[in-house]
Structure formats: C-alpha cells, structure tokens
Amino acid sequence: MASSRMYLLVKCMLILQLMVLIAKNSRALICLPCDKSKCEEPKPCTGSVVLGICGCCSVCAKQKNESCGGVYGLYGTCDRGLRCVIRPPLNGGSITQYEVGNCEDENWDDDQLLGFEPCNENLVTGCNIIDGKCECDSVRTCNNPFEFASQEACQTALQKIEEERPDCSKARCEVQFSPRCPEDSILIEGYAPPGECCPLPSRCVCSPAGCLRKVCQPGHLNILVSKSSGKPGECCDLYECKPVFSVDCSTVECPPVKPVQCPADSYETQVRLTADGCCTLPTRCECLPGLCTFPQCSAGMSPQVMSRGDGTPGRCCDVFECVNETKPACTLNGVEYHDGDMFRMDACRFCRCQGGVSVCFTAQCGVLHCERYYVPDGECCPVCEDPIYPVLSLAGCYVNGQILAHGDHWREDDCTFCQCVSGDARCVAAACGHSCLNPVTVPGECCPVCEEPTYITMAPPACGSLDNCTLLEQSCAFGFRLDPSGCRTCACKSREELCGGLMASCTLKCPFGFQTDIHGCDVCQCRPRHKKCKAVACAKDCPFGYIKNKHGCDTCRCKKCPELPCDKACPMGFQHDELGCLICQCRDQSSSSVTPAVKLGSCLSMDGRRHENGQSWHDGCRDCYCHAGREMCALISCPVPPCDNPTIRPGHCCPTCPEESSSHKPELSEASVCLAPGGEYFVEGETWNIDSCTQCTCHSGRVLCETEVCPPLLCHSPIRTQDSCCPHCPDDPVTPQTPSNDSMPSYCRNEDGDIFLAAESWKPNVCSSCVCLDGAISCFSESCPPVNCARPVLRKGQCCPYCLDATPRAVCHFNGKTYMDEERWDIDSCTHCYCLQGQTLCSTVSCPALPCHQPLTVEGSCCPMCPESYAPTNVPIEKTDQRGDKSRHQPAWPTHSENDVMPQFRGEFGSLQMPYLDGKTPLPSEDAGLHWAWVALPVLMMMLTLAALLLVNQRKQWIPVPCYRTPNKSTCLNNQLVYVDCQKGTKVQVDSSQRMLRIADPDSRYSGYYSMQKHNNLQADNFYQTA
C-alpha cells in the first residue's frame, strides 16, 4: 500500500515537472471560461487589486521595483502611478514587448490634470531594420522611434542577425491569424525573433495617437478617473470634466491675457486653466508636427539649404531651394560621362563619375566548383564548361533566330552563358561574390560589385563658364566638343568624334564585324553570322516587321508586337499589355502566377500550353489543331473499362482499370479524307456539328473535334444522358459548405503540399473529382457505362468513351441535281418543291376566276390579275440554300393585292403531294371554285383561335421581313397566323431554338407583323393566304 502511494507521488512530481518545463518553453496561453466562484481571494495586498491575465480573478497589483510584463503579461500589471519599464537590450536589438520589465514611477505632474498640452518635438536621427535592410531617417517627434542611433550600429546588428540566422528550410510553422485591434491600439505583425524560424503571433499594442484628451470649459477641472492598464481596449486614461465647487470665481481678478499670433510653421496651444479653474493661462506657439520634409527637385536641379531651422516657431524647419545642378562631368578615353553615370573601363573594372572624379573599383568573382571553365568574351569572371565527352553528333543549335555550330558559346542574358553540345543548349549561371554589405548592381552586368574606390582616374578639370554660349543641350545631338583639358567648348561634337573613343579598350575579334548603337557607332559586341536568305516577295504591310523562320530568314507573316527596347534587368520577366506584347515594366513576384495576357486567336490547350491560331501539334495521343481560338483534337477509339474506378495512366491514352497491366492502343480515324461518322464527306476547312455536344472541322484530311471542359462531380457513379454533354450526378450531389465556426479547419492539404480552401472542388485527373470538406479531402470516381457500338470514341479531357449518333441524312435527286434534307427550290413561278426525308414534295398554285375581261400577266407572278387591282409592290428575294449560296430574284409567287390567293396544297402535306421521279414539270390544277373557300371559312377561323392560343406559350424572337398590301381577311393554316399592320413596321416572330429560312429583305415602304411557329421549310412556304 505504501509502495503504491510512493509510486503515485513520484508520478505526480514527474507530471508537475513536465508541466513546468512545458510552461517555460511554451508561448501559448490557455484561459478557461470564467467562473468567479472558483477564484481565490487574494492575500492582503500592499496596493490595489487588478484582474489577472485571463481577466477573471483578482490579483495584487505589482509594486515599485517588482517584475511585470512578459509574454501575455504573465509577470503581472503595475499599480496606479507606476508603469512597466522595459530596458533596451545592450546589443542594440529591438524591443518586442515580450520582455520582462520593472515597475517604476510615472512622474505625473500637475499640468497633466489641467488639460492637454503637446510635447516639444525634437529633431531625431536614427535607423530601424525593415525587411532585412537598415532604413535611416530624420524626423521631428516627441519620442525616439528608432532602434539604432547610427547606420553603423544598425549594420552591425543586421550582420549579427544574418550570422545567427538558423536553417529554416525544413521548419514547419503554424498559420498565424492577425487579431482585430481596438481603436486605441495598432496591429504589430508577427516576426521571427533572432535565432528562430517561425514568427511570433501578431499582437495589438497601445497607440498614444489613439488617445484623445478632453478640454473643459472655464470653471471645470480635467480630473483623472481611471488609469490605463496598457492593454488594447484600455490604453487611454479616462478623464472627466468636473466643476470646481470649492472656489468662488466671482471674487477672483484674472490678469489680462495677450492674444498670440503664431507664424505659418506653428500653431497656438490649447487654452489651459489655473489650479482653481477661474482664470486662463497664456498660450504659446509650437511647431506643426510632420511639417519638415525634404524637397523633391526636377531633373537637373538639386536642393540647397538656404537657412537652418532650430525647432522654434518661425524657424521650425530647414529652408531649401532647388538650384541648377552644375556638377562637373568625367572624361575617359575621349568619352564624356555625367555625374552619377557608371561605365566600364575594361572587362574587370567599373567606374562611377562623382563630382568630376572617376571612382573605379574591381569586379569580384565567385568560387567555381568545376574542373573545366572559360572566360566569355568581354566578361571578367569565368563560368563552368561541360566536361569533354565523345561527340555523338555535330548537330548545331537554333538560338534566337540563328544557327550555332557544335561547341559555340553565347550569352543568353546578363547571368546565363550557354554552349552548343551535340545540338543541345547547355547553359550555366555565372558565380558571383562580394565582400561588402551593399553591393551595387551595374546595368547589363550579372554580378553586383562593391563600390570601394581602388584608384582615381583623373581630377575634375578647372573649366571656365559657358554663359555666353548660345548652344543648348538639345542643339548638339552628339554632345559638346572638349578641349585638351577635358572642358566643354561652345561647339558641337560630330559623330566621328563621338564614336572615336568607344572602341579604344575593346579586345574582341569579331569575324562578322561589330554591332552599332543608336548613333551608328561601333560598340564592343560582335555581330552574328550573316544569314543567306532569299528576298521575300510579300505584299503584306507589316509595321513591326516579318516573322523569321528557323534559319533566321524573313517569312511572309507579320509580327504582332514591336521590338522591346528596354535596358531593365527583370528577374521575374516583363509585363504584357492588353494585346499580349511585352512592355518595359518588370513583373512583380506576386503576379508571377497570374495567367499572362493572351494573344488574339491563340488556343490554351488542356495541358496549359499556348498555341497560335492555325498551329498543329500532337499531344501524345491525338492530333490537335488551333482553329479560331479553339482546341480541336481527333477522336480516338477506346474500349470501355469494366471497373467502377477507371483512370488514365501517365503516358497512356485510353482509360484502364487499376488491375490491368497494359493499355489499349487507340485507333485513329482515317487520314486520307474527312469522312464523318455519319457517312458525310467534308472539304478542307469546313466546320459542322457531329452531334449536339461536338463541333468538328476538316483539317489535312483529319476530322478534328472540339470538346467542352466538364466540372467536378461530387458523387460516385455519375451518369450521362442524351440531352447532356457532360456526366452529372443522378441524385443530389454533395453540397460543400464553408465552415460556420472558427474551430473547423478552413483549408485542406494534399500529398503534394497543395492547399485548397474549404468547399473548393477540383479534378486531379479526368476520371475523379475531389472536394475539401471539414479539413479533409473527399474524392469520387467516375465509372463508365457499357456501350452498344463497335467503336466508341473518347473526347480529349473526358474519362469515358461513348457512341456517336451516326444516322446519315437523306438527300433528294431531281432533274440531275442533288438537294439536301429540308431544302426548297422552285421549278417555275407556280411550282415549289421540297426535300423531306429523301422524298421530293411539290406544290402548285391554283389561280381563281377573275371578274375582268382583260387580265394582266405580271412577270414573275403565277396568276393573272385585273388592271385596277395591280399595284407594283414586288420586292427582291434573297434565298439561302443548304450550301450557304445566296441569290436575288423576283418572287416566285404573285404580287400581293386584294385578289391574291393562297397556294392550294393537295395530298398528305397541305392539299397536294406529287412525288416527281421523272423530272417532268407538273401542270397547274384547274379546280378554281370559290365556294370551297366559304365552306372552309368556319373551320379556318377555329384553327386560327387554336393556333393563337398555342403561339402564346412559344418562346419567340422578332426578325424583320418585307411586307405586302394588307389582305381583306386573315386565315390560319398549319398553325401559322398572319397579322399585318403597314403603319408600324414589319416583323416575324419565330422560335429562337431553330433555324429560320430568310425569305425576303425589308422594304421601308410597307410594314406588317407575322407570327408563325417554325418547324421546317415545308411549313415556312405556307406563310399567307387571302380569301
């Protein structure tokens, strides 16, 4: 029994020590829900009582010289009249507010109880470490905002931080969320302390600028009610204006107060009261905060101090004036350089012009870890070279529009040097080294240099003034001519004089000559090998030049973008404009993942590659072609996998089951002709719809089809119906929702380390879909249903093969011509024919008896008409057949007048069905009885009413068609209703989901409204009738 108790005691002690150890090394603070019944009464306190760090139980306030502060305030809060003072570190480091301090007196004076008075600002100079750099400045402020008094101390601390920086490549840090700070505090973002990889949590700290003090009226005192605790939300002291009842101001005589006029750089302080609250004290002037700034002068001007400021009103700031910059230039080998210009003296030495003095320094090279190296032409530092291997082939390399031989070297950019090895470009980066804290980047050079003077080339010449010279800078395109002493003269320099000194220090041997600059002067860069190209016979006008082929010769194709004259060194590349052309602006690292601007007419394939319009390629499984901005790929034939979770393996083309060892080889369509699965032939460039979901084009004898990208499916075993192009879930799919509380995870991470937000869905491959739910990834597989065709096809980007509807379309043959299904043609002005499902159907017009004795026969009209009723209102007709050909001719029906009649159809379709197999022209019917029209009138009126009710529910769109003279009566035939109003314009209402044959052009002389339900061209022919 005793041993078990001893064992339990030892176990408790070990657990207690472990908890103490964890508490010492942990930065976490766990506060349980407040239950004041469990709080212990604090022992008799020397001072006042304050709340603990969790804000629940009361504890004794810390007294003078006791510890306070620390992480989360674990060491307590100082009593009233005391403040927690944290001493700055001796090594010059920054204060993080997590250090432990001591309680000291606040040193409040009586003036603080009488009103607010701004402090006296002083000019303070110092430095802070911001983003790994020392940022120095001079500001006028009440408190010193700088951590280091000088740049030397800041650089020493920065170098120490770099030396103590740990290896954070394998560190795993928790995601830190920034809190929302009250109005009296500001947010301090978390940062990694010296020696640690993970940043501290962001926190809110009190901001004195957020505290406002009350100004009381005469007869009231500003009394301190409660002292700030130093915590966010309790940062400010609370004052109240209370009347002074103990003093009778009626007997007090106040001295006169003179008004104060402050200068423009200062302001008048607020009115203060005497201790009894009866009289006002004199005000004074104080410098305006944030007034002093450093001026920004225009080009060629520099700021010069005219008078120094001492911080007193009227002289708060230094007074500057922008004056002309007359710094002398530098001259080297006859070339003049302006102040601040950096130039290259030779391969390894650089110079900067500073006040007429050329300060030069030597480039520093890094250590190479290779056995073979070489020094590129015009460079100082060597670069590594590939070891010598047996030459497999002497193939050249095509680089930047020119062909380089095996073994040739070239410079890809400022930091990359390449060599052609057996047809492959082998590139290495230059190794840089420097021994200073702030190396300088030289434009056009890879390695930064240390700007430490090694020698002085020349002293600034004592040159006279050119005040009497009338020449301006822009008058001399090549600069001013220099005298033997290097001073400017009042004469312009010629191009020969400018170019004379540029090649003085050049050591390159260029077999094809040197390149030239904008002035036509030779520069120390070799010209590439001359290209043997034939003259291009091209009629195109290309403002940006021609596109070059693989041999570097011009082709008859225009460049879409101009050349980019830019000398910026952009490590992340350049930005694009709205046309996809490069502009001389560096791309930010944050925008490196943004999709670049797309050129007009290009295609973005499913593998993320960009192809130009008209370009062909092979994606490993099928031939593809960029057609009008759409990716068109060949349909391949694949068997349907019999499992529930098929997948397309890398390097394979057809879906397979996980247990299968081999992949089916896809069968491609015939490449000789464009033969669609429906048995139709198509010519080169023709586009058609193979079904409701697939649009195809004929390219190089291959049928290439476009497919749409299907969204993720959050269910198992989705189905594909005939009326849908993508599979869908048979039941309600999983509905992802964002987390409703903060305890639920807001993101998921997959095996590759990719992060997905809550409720986000995606497709890791074409056969599965995933979603992020409650911090975990749930995936669903697509199963392929069986098919009933011999050769199912597989679209690119989809998982399951399916069958195409290969039903051939019927055609009609008449008089040696072939007509497509639903095509219409005219035999003469009285006979119209149609092709319907392979059968030729024709209709004729029956002419009625006329009351006149001498009827007129109008050209293009079928039936004669009386002279008194003839009105020449014919309009030309535009016909469109199945081939897209258009022709304009006079109407094949009579000019409409009051005596016009509707063509009479007989037979199954309308009133007449006449299959013409021998090609003979039919004779018009002689049945012209008018009494049949009166017999059929009630029936037609009933059909009119029914058709009107049906047409109300149809989805229609309005298109303009020509009008004719309004008939006496309108009748209904084949669900077509005519409304005519020649005063309001002509429109026809048709179903927007089907094609409508355009039968005439608008005529502004007449107007009318037609409402008809369109089924096919056969019904479109019966579009009016009069009786």
Curated annotation (Swiss-Prot):
Residue span(s) of domain Antistasin-like: 463-492, 499-526, 533-558, 561-586
InterPro entries reported in the protein's UniProt record: Antistasin-like, CRIM1, CRIM1_C, Growth_fac_rcpt_cys_sf, Hirudin/antistatin, IGFBP-like, VWF_dom
Disulphide bridges: 31-54, 34-56, 39-57, 45-60, 68-84, 78-103
Xref: Pfam families: Antistasin (PF02822), CRIM1_C (PF19442), IGFBP (PF00219), VWC (PF00093)
Glycosylation sites: 65, 324, 468, 741
Keyword Manganese: no
Region annotation Disordered: where it falls in the sequence: 877-897
Membrane disposition: Single-pass type I membrane protein
Signal sequence, renumbered to the chain: 1-28
Domain VWFC: 328-385, 395-451, 601-658, 672-730, 746-804, 810-867
Main subcellular location: membrane
Extracellular compartment spans: 29-931
GO molecular function, one term: serine-type endopeptidase inhibitor activity
GO BP field: blood vessel development; notochord morphogenesis; somitogenesis
Record's keyword terms, sorted: Disulfide bond, Glycoprotein, Membrane, Repeat, Signal, Transmembrane, Transmembrane helix
Motif (Cell attachment site): 308-310, 883-885
Role description: May play a role in CNS development by interacting with growth factors implicated in motor neuron differentiation and survival.
Annotated protein name in UniProt: Cysteine-rich motor neuron 1 protein
